[in-house]
C-alpha cells in the first residue's frame, strides 16, 4: 500500500501557522488518528537527551526525570534493541494514551489511543500507524475472553500484554513502548508558560471565545477547552483531532526550546505523565541518531468495519487491510515481507462477512457456527 499525499501528513510548518484546509481528514468511521502522542514522546526524548547531554549542570535533573518514567515490562524482546540503537537501525515504538477523563485515573484502565511509530534514520522518515481502539482482537494470554477490544489489552495485563497483542495481531516486532497520561496535558502547557495558537475556526466554548486566524496565547486550561469542543465543528471529531494536534505541536515547539529544557518544573511535570521502557541511555541514543527521522512524517491507519457482536460495537479489519498495514510497518523497519497475524489462534475470523451479532443472544456467533461469550469489560490489573 503506497502512502501518497492524501494518506500521510508532513509537519514542517510552525504550529501556530497551520491552515485549516491543510488538515481536512480523509473519511473514515470511528477511527482516531491522534499523532499527538508521538510529539509528547519526542519532547521527552529531546528534553531529557539534550538536557543531560549538553548541559552537565542539568544532568542529574534530566537523569532523575528519565529514571522516574522508566518502567520495563516482562516482554522478551523479539530483536536485539541495544544493537539496533547502536547501529542506528529502524526501531518501532508502541504509543499508548490513557485519558483520565473525569475518573481521576492515572495510567490505569483501557487505552484511549494506540499507535505504532517507526523511526527510520536512514530514510529520514517517521511512520505512524493508528490502530482502532475497538479493533476486534484476541488479547494475548486472555484468549478465553474473546471477543475483545484492542484497548482492553492494557487493562488486562499492562504494557506487556498490549505489546504482545499488537505483535501477534500484525506480525510486527515492537521494540519499545510508551504510555502517556493525557490528563496531565494542562500542567505541561502551564510549565512552559503557555502556547501560541491561531484557532482553526471561530467558536465559543466553556467561557472562552476563539477567533479564527487570530494568534492567541493560551494557558493550559484555555488550550484544553480549545481542544475539547466538537459539536460546533463542521468536521466533528476530526476537527477536534486537528485542534489537539495543533496544540501538541505548539507544545512540542515550545518544549524543545532551551528555556524549557532548563525548566525543572517542565521536566518534573513531563516525568509524571509518561511511562516507557526506554532507558535514559536509550533516549540519548534516540536524540543523537534518530532525530533526523522526524524530517518527514507519514501517517495512516488500520481501517475496520463497525459490527455489533454480543451487543458491543467492534471495528473488524479485513485480512487485506491488516496485511497492508503489516506491509507498511515491516517496510519501514527494513524487514522482509511476512503474512499479517491472525485474530484468534490461527483461525481466520477477520473478514467482516464472517462475524455478526446473533440478535437474540448475548453471544457472538461466526458464520461457521462457533459461539463466543459476550464482550466483558476488563478489570484493570494494576500493571504498567
Descriptions of predicted regions:
Residues 2-384:
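Non-catalytic, solvent-exposed segments at the cell envelope interface
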